[in-house]
Regions:
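Conserved beta-strand hairpin/beta-sheet module of binuclear metal-dependent hydrolase folds
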Residues: 75-87, 96-102, 110-113
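Amide-donor transfer/coupling interface in amidating biosynthetic enzymes
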Residues: 1-74, 88-95, 99, 126, ...
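Cysteine-nucleophile active-site neighborhood
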Residues: 100, 105-174
């Protein structure tokens, strides 16, 4: 999948070195297709690392994706420079009138606090409410998943006796759901958290379905039955060395962390861990983009754009009356479908092309 990012985003060089197709705005414009608009609310402390991880995870289908990074106005990042945020991120106020095909809400290192104690909870709650009407499908990761389950369904989180950290085995529970299509029956995925949500609370909500869980790590993947809200209580996007970096960070802080489970060879914290979960991560995000974003989103995200197309349809009716009024393009919907997704035109056309006819 070609990922559209700003030309000088630091993650670009890393991804290009991995042979991942990255485009800037000029190249994307020349392709004459409507990209999927994905909004990423990055709450992780090391934002540049998370940018790379998520863009990598989104890069595995032929669809073009335009990623917008969102920052909170009620929180000041301690680990990412203001210049980076000002250059590559947008505020919620600047985009809240837009609609997006998909959204990702990341985890955050605030899980030992009650949700209402988090200094940006009110702003985050407003964003999660906004997703109901402005986003086709939203993925929540780790603490973001716990926050989403709490906000949307009132499902609580519980503190664990010790941190859950490592690579855990999981089992798919319902293979008929497209989100887990092509998953193995069992798969590995990283977890890194102090809190958890529990099966018995989720089962009280028939509008939710549990898709994967682990005997050791608990719930991994939950989805609303309409596919609009997806909750991942793990970190499938993590790099090979992310858990290693977290372990040594906590060690240097004097926290006496346990070694991540099933991660280091022979439990040697100075060995290079084996990457055993990348295929799962790629499959999860590819399925999400294909089945819950691309196949479900309207071609035109904004009502204003739809009105412009209807106006253009009626103008063309007057210009080519026989073809449009009495032929197979006899209403604006068919007209729009033809010009945006038709083998007859040879390519998908953008709104600007439709309006220039």
């Amino acid at each position: 999948m070609p990922i559209k990012v700003q030309r000088d985003l630091p993650a670009r060089a890393i991804l290009e070195s991995e042979n991942i197709f990255i485009m800037d705005e000029d190249r994307a414009m020349s392709q004459d297709i409507r990209p999927l608009e994905i909004l990423i609310l990055n709450l992780m402390p090391l934002k540049e690392d998370t940018e790379t991880q998520l863009l990598r995870a989104l890069s595995n289908t032929p669809l073009q994706v335009d990623c917008t990074f969102l920052m909170l106005s009620t929180h000041v990042s301690k680990n990412t420079s203001a210049s980076h945020l000002n250059k590559f991120y947008v505020s919620f106020d600047s985009i809240k009138k837009k609609k997006f095909d998909g959204m990702i809400i990341t985890g955050a290192p605030v899980e030992n606090m009650e949700f209402e104690e988090v200094n940006y909870w009110e702003e985050l709650s407003g964003i999660m409410e906004w997703t109901k009407t402005h986003v086709t499908s939203t993925i929540h990761i780790c603490w973001g998943a716990q926050a989403g389950l709490y906000y949307h369904y009132g499902i609580p989180k519980y503190k664990r006796t010790e941190k859950l950290s490592g690579i855990y085995n999981h089992r798919v529970l319902d293979r008929k759901v497209p989100l887990v299509r092509s998953f193995n029956d069992t798969f590995l995925a990283p977890h890194s958290r102090y809190t958890e949500v529990r099966r018995e609370d989720i089962e009280k909500h028939p509008e939710l379905v549990i898709l994967a869980e682990s005997e050791e790590a608990g719930i991994f993947l939950v989805m609303s039955r309409d596919g609009k809200q997806i909750f991942v209580q793990g970190h499938p996007e993590y790099d090979r060395m992310t858990l290693n970096n977290e372990y040594h960070r906590d060690l240097n802080k004097g926290l006496n962390p346990s070694l991540p489970v099933n991660y280091y060879e022979d439990n040697d914290p100075f060995s290079v861990p084996e990457l055993t979960w990348r295929n799962t991560s790629n499959t999860l995000y590819t399925n999400w983009l294909n089945f819950y974003v691309y196949q479900m989103t309207p071609y035109l995200l904004d009502d204003g754009e739809e009105e412009l197309v209807h106006q253009q349809y009626h103008r063309l009716c007057n210009k080519y009356e026989k073809t449009f009024r009495h032929g197979k393009y006899s209403n604006a919907g068919r007209f729009l479908s033809f010009f945006t997704n038709s083998s007859e035109t040879g390519s998908n056309l953008t709104l600007s092309h439709i309006l220039s006819l």
